[in-house]
Regions:
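A Zn2+-metalloprotease active-site environment signal
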Residues: 6-19, 27-233
Length: 233
């Protein structure tokens, strides 16, 4: 995936990396959401998402070298993720203006290490990326992308971009009133019925991620290259 017009704006970015917090429980259903989204996109069976942090190293020299390498990789992932996030906001700003005659309200992009808290509760790396409707923020531990590439066999920029675009898709659902409507229906639905609607909510977020990819190309934000689709399947 090639950037034609990249947006590195950080006005809607919150960096919590390296800021330790008490490890909290993952938001209910978040793991299932990510597993479903990745399954639909890659065709792989992701039955669990595990902690992606690796163990310690044996010497101080090795530790310094590895830490420097990881820090550089982490920063590159931050830049890439922020560009995808900003491009998704640019796309939905255009769509809301042209099709809905509404002003698009941008969410906030939060990167964290190991664990964090949100208005939806606590979460850790094992939760995977998630969107919290209560504070309108997208959360991600960037180490997730290493797991996406190695354990889940979904390498490539497009696979990583899809994950972020999917979470922004949940923000779009919030703005359109879809999320609130489902919450209002919850008390009237059985658990089985509610789960069916939850799956549909995920499918729609997948569809919105596809809209991002399509519009981002039309708006000359990105250009898909040979192998991009294959790398995510």
């Amino acid at each position: 995936m090639k950037w034609i017009n990249s947006n590195d704006d950080q006005s809607n970015y919150e960096d919590r990396r390296g800021k330790g917090v008490k490890r909290g429980a993952a938001i209910g259903g978040v793991g299932t959401i990510i597993v479903l989204a990745l399954y639909l996109f890659t065709g792989q069976d992701f039955s669990s998402v595990v902690n992606v942090l690796s163990g310690g190293v044996t010497t101080q020299t090795q530790e310094t070298s590895v830490d420097d390498s990881r820090a550089k990789e982490n920063e590159e992932l931050k830049v890439f993720s922020l560009r995808v996030f900003n491009s998704a906001n640019d796309v939905w700003t255009e769509i809301f203006n042209e099709q809905f005659q509404q002003k698009y309200r941008k969410p906030t992009f939060v990167t964290f290490t190991d664990a964090t808290t949100s208005e939806c509760g606590g979460a850790n790396s094992a939760s995977g990326p998630f969107y919290c409707p209560a504070d309108e923020k997208v959360y991600i531990d960037l180490a997730f992308f290493n797991e996406l590439s190695t354990r889940f066999r979904a390498p490539g920029d497009l696979a990583m971009a899809y994950v972020i675009a999917h979470e922004v898709g949940h923000h779009v659902q919030k703005l359109l009133g879809i999320t609130d409507k489902l919450d209002q229906m919850r008390s009237r639905l059985s658990e089985e019925e509610y789960n069916k609607y939850s799956v549909k909510l995920e499918l729609q977020a997948d569809f919105f991620a596809g809209i991002w990819a399509n519009y981002a190309q039309k708006l000359n934000i990105i250009q898909l290259e040979n192998g991009d689709i294959e790398s995510g399947t």
